[in-house]
Design a protein with these regions (language model features):
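Residues that cap or initiate secondary-structure elements
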Residues: 48-50, 77, 87, 121, ...
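Short beta-strand element of the conserved SAM-dependent methyltransferase core
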Residues: 22-23, 44, 53-56, 91-95, ...
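Extracellular/periplasmic metallocenter environments
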Residues: 108-152
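Hydrophobic beta-strand residues in large extracellular and virion-surface proteins
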Residues: 42-44, 51-53, 79, 90-92, ...
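Intrinsically disordered/low-complexity terminal segments and short unstructured peptides
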Residues: 2, 20-22, 34, 42, ...
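Contiguous segments within soluble domain cores/interaction surfaces
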Residues: 67-106
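N-terminal edge beta-strand
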Residues: 32-74
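Bacterial Sec-dependent N-terminal signal peptides
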Residues: 1-28
Length: 152
């Protein structure tokens, strides 16, 4: 009986500890969401017949207007593009705004690409993502934007 009492006691303590560490009791406005503009990750995927970009900042992507997708990054920051679901390979081509890069995007293995931003106060690059899916060898291209901007 003592063993059962100990188990119940430990269980109740662990439930109490979990409720203390939960953020459910804090109003959502009080939980500060940190957005990292120094190290940005953009994941490229192909889902339900559509190309998608999801970045670590949560910027909205509209597959009907991919050229409106904009990622913000701090001066001197780094960006990494990675392949997600159903992307076989991709490469990044800078169409305009090369001056915002310290190191231009470099594809290491056709599924990861890295770039380092210059220490400029602001700027914009338009770039193309040329990708193939696991369903086809045909190449597709979309043209999002990358904005270099100081953030507080």
């Amino acid at each position: 009986m003592k063993t059962l009492s100990k188990v119940i006691f430990i269980f109740l303590i662990s439930i109490g500890f979990l409720s203390l560490t939960s953020t459910d009791h804090i109003p959502s406005k009080q939980i500060k969401q940190e957005t990292n503009y120094k190290k940005v990750i953009s994941t490229l995927s192909f889902e339900n017949g559509e190309f998608l970009i999801k970045d670590s900042q949560g910027n909205p992507f509209d597959s009907n207007n991919p050229e409106d997708f904009t990622t913000y990054i701090s001066p001197g920051g780094k960006i990494k593009w990675v392949s997600g679901d159903n992307i076989k390979s991709f490469k990044i081509r800078i169409d305009s705004g090369m001056d915002i890069f310290e190191d231009l995007p470099a594809n290491l293995d056709n599924v990861n690409c890295f770039a380092k931003m210059a220490n400029k106060r602001q700027g914009e690059a338009k770039y193309s993502i040329i990708y193939t899916t696991k369903f086809s060898n045909k190449s597709f291209t979309i043209d999002p934007k990358l904005r270099l901007k100081e953030h507080a």
